[in-house]
Amino acid sequence: MVREEVAGSTQTLQWKCVESRVDSKRLYYGRFILSPLRKGQADTVGIALRRALLGEIEGACITRAKFGSVPHEYSTIAGIEESVQEILLNLKEIVLRSNLYGVRDASICVKGPRYITAQDIILPPSVEIVDTAQPIANLTEPIDFCIDLQIKRDRGYQTELRKNYQDGSYPIDAVSMPVRNVNYSIFSCGNGNEKHEILFLEIWTNGSLTPKEALYEASRNLIDLFLPFLHAEEEGASFEENKNRFTPPLFTFQKRLTNLKKNKKGIPLNCIFIDQLELTSRTYNCLKRANIHTLLDLLSKTEEDLLRIDSFRMEDRKHIWDTLEKHLPIDLLKNKLSF
C-alpha cells in the first residue's frame, strides 16, 4: 500500500477503470479508482477488497487425474518423456473458465508420437480452456495415452493427502484462485478540512475472468457478508434487554417479509437476495449460475426460463414454489410468478 499527496477536487463518490490490458492469455491487468473518500475510508475499502479478491473469488480447475496401471505418482510411463508427477503438475497449471458447480468429468485420449497440450482435453459443455497451448506431456513413441480428469469449481487453495488410490487416480492440489495479485494505493487530495482520499486498486487475473469481473464478484461477496447487519431485529431495544439473549438467524427471508407486511410497506424485491430464501445449496447454485441474485430476478423468470438452467430439475422448481408460497403474499405470487 502506497500513500501520496496530490491536488484534487471533491465530487460524488464514483469508481472508474483507468487502465485495462491483456499481457498474455493467462495474465490480465486492470487499474481502478474510487473517489472521493473521507480520511481512513480508503484503507478500509482497500483492505476489504484485497482480501475478498484474493480469497473469495471462485475458479474452476482440475482436481484429479486417473491413469491406467500406474503404481504411484513418481512412476514413468514407457513412451512418455515426463513422469506421472510432472504430468500432474502440468495439469495443475491448466486455467479453465466455467460457471458450473459440482464435479465435472473430462478426459484426454490421444495416440503418439506427439505433444499433448491443453487443447487435447475433451471438456464438458460450458467449460473453456483459457490457454490451449499449455503443455501437458510429450509422447515419444506410438502409444495410446488416456487420462480421466475431474474438474471442480471452488475457492482458495485446496490440498489433498497423497495416497495411492486403487483405481489409479491421483489428487491434484487445487488452486482455485483466478486473481493472481492485488495492490492498492491511497492518494490524499485537498487541503485542511476539505481533505479527501483517492483509492487506486490494481488487479491481476489468470485470464479466466477479467479484473472488472473479479472486482464485481468480490464486491458482491462483501455485500452478502454485511447484509445481515443492515436490518435490526427490534428497533429501539436496549442493550440490557438483549445482551444475554441469543437469537439464531435473525435476518432470514421469512422475518424480513413478516416485518415488511407488518409495516404495510411494499416489498423491495430487489433488496432481498436469494441466499435469504433458505434454499438448498443445489437450488441456490443453479440460480446463481443463471445470474439470479435477488427475489426480483427470480420472480421475473417464467417456469420455462428456470427449466432451461443447466442442471435445474423439477424438484428445484417445486422447492422454490413451496418456499415462496409459504412466505409471500398470495396476491404478489399471482401477479409476479408465472409457474
Swiss-Prot record:
GO BP terms: DNA-templated transcription
Main location: plastid
Any single GO CC term annotated in Swiss-Prot or TrEMBL for this entry: DNA-directed RNA polymerase complex
Subcellular location: Plastid, Chloroplast
Stored Pfam families: RNA_pol_A_bac (PF01000), RNA_pol_A_CTD (PF03118), RNA_pol_L (PF01193)
InterPro entries linked: DNA-dir_RNA_pol_insert, DNA-dir_RNA_pol_RpoA/D/Rpb3, DNA-dir_RpoA, RBP11-like, RNAP_asu_C, RNApol_insert_sf
Ranges for region Alpha C-terminal domain (alpha-CTD): 264-339
This enzyme's EC code(s): 2.7.7.6
GO molecular function, one term: DNA binding
Alpha N-terminal domain (alpha-NTD), as annotated region: 1-233
Keyword annotations of the record: Chloroplast, DNA-directed RNA polymerase, Nucleotidyltransferase, Plastid, Transcription, Transferase
Catalysed reactions, semicolon-separated: RNA(n) + a ribonucleoside 5'-triphosphate = RNA(n+1) + diphosphate
Secretion signal span: none
UniProt remark on domains: The N-terminal domain is essential for RNAP assembly and basal transcription, whereas the C-terminal domain is involved in interaction with transcriptional regulators and with upstream promoter elements.
Quaternary structure annotation from Swiss-Prot or TrEMBL: In plastids the minimal PEP RNA polymerase catalytic core is composed of four subunits: alpha, beta, beta', and beta''. When a (nuclear-encoded) sigma factor is associated with the core the holoenzyme is formed, which can initiate transcription.
Homology family: Belongs to the RNA polymerase alpha chain family.
Protein's UniProt name: DNA-directed RNA polymerase subunit alpha
